[in-house]
Amino acid sequence: MLFTVAWASLAAMFSFSIAMVVWGRNGDGTLNF
């Protein structure tokens, strides 16, 4: 259970950081992946 929660939070933080990099590189605030 604890491992599952830890893995889910790690995956969420990783995907969030990737999204921040994509949005920051895009520069105009649109969701253009």
Swiss-Prot record:
GO MF: electron transporter, transferring electrons within cytochrome b6/f complex of photosystem II activity
Q: Which UniProt keywords apply?
A: Electron transport, Membrane, Photosynthesis, Thylakoid, Transmembrane, Transmembrane helix, Transport
Query: What SUPFAM superfamilies does the record point to?
Result: PetN subunit of the cytochrome b6f complex
One CC-aspect GO term: plasma membrane-derived thylakoid membrane
Q: Does the keyword Lipoprotein apply?
A: no
Query: Which compartments does it reside in?
Result: Cellular thylakoid membrane
Q: Does the keyword Electron transport apply?
A: yes
Q: Where are the transmembrane segments?
A: 2-22
Membrane topology annotation = Single-pass membrane protein
Its main localization is membrane
Task: Please give a single GO biological process term from the UniProt record.
Answer: photosynthesis
Its family?
Belongs to the PetN family.
Q: Which HAMAP family match?
A: Cytb6_f_PetN (MF_00395)
What subunit structure does UniProt give?
The 4 large subunits of the cytochrome b6-f complex are cytochrome b6, subunit IV (17 kDa polypeptide, PetD), cytochrome f and the Rieske protein, while the 4 small subunits are PetG, PetL, PetM and PetN. The complex functions as a dimer.
Q: What does the UniProt function comment say about this protein?
A: Component of the cytochrome b6-f complex, which mediates electron transfer between photosystem II (PSII) and photosystem I (PSI), cyclic electron flow around PSI, and state transitions.
Q: What is this protein called?
A: Cytochrome b6-f complex subunit 8
Taxonomic lineage from the root: Bacteria, Bacillati, Cyanobacteriota, Cyanophyceae, Synechococcales
Gene of this entry: petN
